A protein has these predicted regions:
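Structured surface interface patches that mediate subunit assembly and partner/cofactor docking
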Residues: 1-12, 65-75, 115-220
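An N-terminal domain-cap segment
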Residues: 2-51
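Short coil/turn segments at secondary-structure junctions
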Residues: 3-7, 40, 86-94, 130-133
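Amphipathic alpha-helix face/heptad-repeat signature
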Residues: 12-19, 52, 98-101, 105, ...
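A structural signal for well-ordered alpha-helical segments within the folded catalytic domains
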Residues: 17, 21, 47, 54, ...
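Structural signal for well-ordered, non-membrane alpha-helices
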Residues: 20-28, 57-61, 103-114, 147-150, ...
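Conserved alpha-helical segments that form or flank metal/cofactor-binding pockets of metalloenzymes
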Residues: 47-79
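A short, structured beta-strand-centered segment in the mid-to-C-terminal lobe
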Residues: 82-105
């Protein structure tokens, strides 16, 4: 793990805490019936999305806490099976319970960031996928989760409202992923995609928008 960019961490934390507040404001207005209704993600209700965001925050907290001790922690100690069980366990809770648990997990994670020292930010942790990542990347990864899933909730928040910081950083990552997954000579995005506004191009890339003349994007 290299030396973290503390100013970039600051910007990601600022953007993520704002996204957290929007998520909580939206969640506070949802009824039990709203949470049972489908989200834009196949097979997931809105309750599944919120419960995933709750579990995701707790997992990131575990990574940060372990890094603060100089250890490499697991986001989901039981792996992807634990992650998937955790999403189901609580997705059907009453709205007040689910949102209270979401709020608690958000402030648990933010508290880890606000108390974080050099040891924590220099550390690394293991995602549910098994990939090892710098803890300094966690605020950005959480920003991505909250931003995209706010759209997935199907409550009227489109990609047009995604924060500029997220769009800029994720476009860079998606372009690198595209280049790495295509053979020589096909490493550039399709010309039609390059004609799109940045936010729509990103929404297409992560499969949150369909565009005439383009196949479905590769997704996250």
């Amino acid at each position: 793990v290299g030396t973290p960019d503390l100013r970039l961490i600051d910007r990601c934390v600022e953007a993520c805490t704002a996204a957290h507040q929007r998520l909580l404001a939206v969640s506070d207005g949802l009824t039990d019936a709203d949470l049972r209704a489908p989200s834009l993600l196949p097979g997931w209700s809105r309750g599944h999305v919120l419960n995933h965001l709750r579990r995701n925050a707790h997992g990131f907290s575990l990574m940060c806490e372990a890094a603060g001790r100089g250890e490499e922690g697991l986001q989901y100690p039981g792996g992807m099976d634990e992650r998937n069980r955790g999403i189901e366990d609580g997705a059907d809770d009453p709205a007040p319970t689910l949102v209270a648990n979401l709020r608690a997990s958000i402030y648990e994670l933010e508290a880890k960031w606000f108390r974080g020292d050099g040891t924590m930010w220099m550390g690394s942790g293991v995602l549910g996928t098994g990939a090892t990542v710098p803890v300094s990347d966690v605020p950005y990864r959480r920003l991505r989760e909250v931003t995209v899933h706010l759209t997935d909730l199907d409550v009227g928040i489109s990609h047009e409202e995604w924060p500029d910081l997220f769009v800029r950083m994720e476009l860079d990552r998606q372009k690198m992923a595209w280049a790495a997954s295509h053979p020589m000579g096909l490493t550039q995005l399709p010309a039609r995609a390059m004609e799109l506004p940045d936010k729509l191009r990103l929404a297409w890339l992560i499969n949150r928008a369909r565009v005439d003349g383009l196949p479905d994007g590769p997704g996250l």
